[in-house]
Structures are given as C-alpha cells and as structure tokens.
Amino acid sequence: MDVLANPGPLKDIVLYDQEKHVSSAVWDGQERGALRCHEHTSKLGEWKLKPKQIELVERAGFGFLRRIPAISLDNPLISALVERWRRETNTFHFTVGEMTVTLEDIALLLGLGIDGKPVIGLTYTTCSAVCERYLGKSPASNSASGGMVKLSWLKDNFSECPDDASFEEVERRTRAYLLYLVGSTIFSTTTGNKVPVMYLPLFEDFDDAGTFAWGAAALAFLYRALGNASVKSQSTICGCLTLLQCWSYYHLNIGRPKLNREPIHDQFPFVLKWKGKQNGPTANRDVVFYRKALDVMKPTDVVWLPYENMNGGDMSDRMRKSLLLGRSKTMLISFDKAERHLPDRCRKQFDLFQDIPADVQRWVRKSRGVDGGVDLSNKMESELSEWEMRWENIVPDDVQGVDEADYMRWYLGITRKIVGRPISLSSEFQRTISNVRDILELAENFQIHDLDLERGNMISRIIGLAQDCLRDQVGVTATPETQQQIELGKRMRGKERVRRKGMGKRRKGIDPMEDYGGSEDESQFGPLVEVGQMHLPLSHTNSVYDGTHMYDAVTKVDDMELCDTIPQLPETQDIHKIEGSLLDDTDKFVEESKLQEEFDGEEPTESYDVKKEDKESKVEDDDAAKGFSDVSGEENANREEEDETEMGESVAESSSLDRRGENTVVA
C-alpha cells in the first residue's frame, strides 16, 4: 500500500494508541515545534564539596553521575526522537526496526547501578517535617510546594560546607546535594525548578543508598517522560535528557556532532565522550530536519554495538556483571512510576538476530503523583514481583531458523513507517525560492556603510547570487533597491533617471527607487563586445563603495557565448562598455551618429582624459553632495571641449561615465 495513503500502522495489534500519538498530528499538519526540555544541570558546578562529602556521594552510588558535566541539549533532535517513541512498546520505531534505551545503556553511559533494591518508598504531602529531619532545617512557604522543594533553596542553604562542620552537618549537606543532583538530572520534573523530597529518606544511610537500583529507576522515569511527551497534546519533556541525547549520538548517525578533540574511548562513564565544545551545524537544524532524516534512515546510519571496543576501565566488577540485565524482560520502578523493559524487541542491540517478538501485554500505568502520602510498596505488588524475577527473564541467545526478512515484513505492517508527510518537489522548490527572496531582501537592506571592503563585497556577492537565482522565475517581483544602495551605486543623468534592465535598457522618467528585475536576455553575463574573432561576455558587478559599475570579461572558453557581431571596432582603439542594448528611436539615432563619427576618423562626440584626475574628483564630490548629478547639455559641451583624450580607459575607470551623466559611449 502507498505510504502516502496510509503511513501505518496497517494493523493496530501493537500500536493501538495511534490517534493520541504526536505523529498523527504531524501528519495532519499540526506542528508543535521543539519540546521544552527540562534538565537543570547548569548550576551543579556551583556546589563546593569537601573530600568527606565526595566520599559519601560515592558510597551512595552517585560517584560517576557527579562527574558528568552539563551537556548542551539539542532540543530539536530530542523532539524528533520523541515522535518515534511508542509507549505501547517503550521503544523507538525507526525504519530499520525497533530500538530502545536499555539497562545496559544507562549503566555504561551514566555509571549508575542497575541491579539492587527498587527505588520506592513513602511519598509526602508537605516538606517541613522530612526536611527538618534529614537536612536540619525546613524551607519557607515560598520555597516549597506540597511535597516538593525548590532547587534554589537547596543550593542557597547547603552548597558550601564549612571546614569546621560536624560530621552530622556534613551528612546533612551531602543529602541536600544528592537531592539536588537527582532532581537536576535523572529525576528532573516539568516544574522546572523543584524536586520531590520523597528521595531524602533513601539517603539516610549512605551505604544503604548504594544498594538501590538507581539506574533502573532513572530509566523508568525517562520511559514515562518519553511516553507522556509522545502524546500530541504535550509540549514539554523531563527526565535524564543527557542520557537520551548521548544514547542517540552513540547509536544513530543523525545529529551526531564532531568532537574538537580525539575522544578518550575508555573514559568511564561513556557519556564523558561528548563533554566539552563540539563542532557541527546542529545550531540551525530544526525538528523538521531531524524528522526527515529519521524518516529516510538507512541501516548504515545505525550503530548497533557502539560500546564493543570500549572496556570501561573504571567500572566496578559488580556493575560489569550486572550488564546482562540489559537483556532482562522486567518491570522498572521509580516510586509511583512502573514501566516495562522489553529488550526482546531490540535483540540486534545485543548482537542477536531479531525475530518476531511476543505480543505486548497491555497494562494500566499507575501514577499517584508525589503528594499521595502513602507507601507505594503496598500499591505495586505485581510490578515489584516482576522486578524480583529480573534474573530469570533474560532474553535467550539466538535460536535456529530465525529469518529477519520475516521480521521486517511483519514489522512494516504494525509500525508507523514515516512521521512527516512527504512534500512534493514543486512545493520544496517554491519554499526555496521564497527563502532566496528573503535572503535577497535582507542583503539589500543590510547596513553596509560601517563594513570593511571585504565584507561589503561579500554582501554584494550575496545580492548578485540571489538575483541570479530569481532571474528566470515566472512572476518573480523585482526587489526594490534601498536608499542606501541608490546613494552608493546609482546616479541621475541630466533630467533623466535611468534604470538598467536586461542588457542596459535606458528609459526616461523612471523613479530611482524602481525595481530592478532580472535580465530578459538569455545571456547570463551581461553585454557582449567583440575582441578579435571571439565575443566575450562582460560580467556586471556593482561596487557598493564608489558607486561604479564594473565589467569583467569572462576568459574561460567554456563560459563564452556565441552571438551576432556588432560593428567591427578599429583594433587601435580600446573597447569601452556598451550600455543599453535596447534604445529608443531618438537614442539610437544619436548612437549611430557617434559611431559614424568614430569610423570616419573624427574625435568621438564625448570623450574623457584618464589623466584629468582633478576634474573627475571635483565632479565626484559634486555628485556625492547632491546624491544624484544634474548635468545640463551646456555643461556637457564644456566638458567635451576641455577633455581632449586618447581612448583607452580601463574597465574600472569606465564607471565615471555613469557619474558624469553620459548615455552610451563607444570608442
């Protein structure tokens, strides 16, 4: 079936919540843009921990997480990944099959424990009592909300431990740091600046805190956040987004930045590979860009085993042995959140052949919020039982007779093949033309007076390229010149206002602000003059600094064009620019008279002495003062008598013709 008619799923046996999913809204043209990503790591470095505190943090199981610096988030990339996340399976549905963030990923990337007691306990409706007990002080009413406390209150009151602090005070300040750490990273909420105090009792004994499966809890929290954000009505996402982004960097060749340095492959945890400044054009990439990339992703864009050459020398033996839990079909628990971990749907991430996975059992997600005031252990008995059986539910090794072609045929029937509706080539072309018009308008309105010569010429080059792109477009409205460009590049000629169009057409009574359209001539390089037996197109360029019009002869044979010859000029004469391919009848008569005078050996009616710099300078100064020159016929005649010249002006000097009010001069 045509993917445009039905992008999937063709059968709703797996993705039964398609109508609620953001991909349905995107297909219908309802763009929500990039998600607001809530992760609060920017001020973690302001905590000044003493050696005793660092020791307690490591005993609690957060020694590696503490070392991870703030990593700039790519919100559009994260948003595009969310569009591929399905909460029915807790996996990404890509073109190559399903993938997910596993327990193995979180252990290797963050260095958090994935085996141990589930992170669950009491929830609280107020902060005062629990903060007083574990921190030694309680927040004011403006620093707390229900069972949550502001991160800023924790930092302001506990970020620096006095040198002479008692051991009890050191423990209290360390608990405050741990609460801030988890609330800023693995358990960040959409509130943006608060963390639940229900984690504090788990830090009462630091050695006991190290026996919890914090990595499994962090993954449950992220799964829930991804599922919530995939609903089309949502606009925010929380959880450990550094984990999600770095997982994508390792597994997908989409949005991956280039490192400014050679990575340290064995630095553990592996998320440290992406710390520091990075290169790459990600700044200008939006959700649509990443969505298109994911829609056409190929198998070669996927790295199924990104850690196989990384040994993680600092990893403990306990953690190394627990990596097998990455293949465990189990339930992940984080207080009020329980999420299924289904690695059997992503066997290729463990170097196994992918067969058709078992049906996903539908389950009702339990969530009582953080203000329930109850012990959740009594509310999640079945989920806790599954976690207890985690080592008995390891996905087996390869079985005989697995055909991945059968899997892909099945998968394409149950998945959402693409998220973005394909755009026709004509629509893409029109969008490009519209963008070029915008670029041209911006360039023409750019304030170039304060720029140096190089940058000014660069702006001129941009204008020329944009005009060249728009030249042959039907219905393209010519872009008006700005007053700034008129002052720099155009001059009035007598009582005549001139507009160049095509190959230099002259028309009277044209406003100097009138549009400059593209050339009607097929030549791409401007007027043609004969040199010997070859006709060289002259490339027309405006100088934005002195108002001259420069013509550069194209010298490459491949760029030359054939044309009808113009009258043969004497070889002893230099070639001046020919301006105006289409003349009014009166103008044509004047031009023919000038040509005839020249061929008869007479001095041209109008000529200039290139050595009379003082006279030119005076005229230029007058022009600059007026903005446009008004030169009467009598003044022209006086100049003709004064200027006895030999022909042979250079191309750059021909620009003075414009400033003196001349029409067309042929030497």
Swiss-Prot record:
UniProt feature, compositional bias: Basic residues: 492-508
GO molecular function, one term: transaminase activity
Primary localization: nucleus
Residues with the N-acetylmethionine modification: 1
InterPro entries linked to this entry: AminoTfrase-like_pln_mobile, MAIN-like
Keyword Transmembrane carried by entry: no
Pfam families on file: PMD (PF10536)
Expression by tissue: Expressed in root tips, the shoot apical meristem (SAM), leaves, mature flowers and embryos.
Residue ranges with Acidic residues bias: 512-523
Keyword terms: Acetylation, Aminotransferase, Nucleus, Transferase
Ranges of compositional bias, category Basic and acidic residues: 608-618, 656-667
Location within or outside the cell: Nucleus
GO biological process, one term: meristem maintenance
Positions of region (Disordered): 492-523, 594-667
CC terms in the record's Gene Ontology section: nucleus
Function: Maybe required to maintain cell division activity in meristematic cells.
Protein name: Protein MAIN-LIKE 2
Species for this entry: Arabidopsis thaliana (Mouse-ear cress)
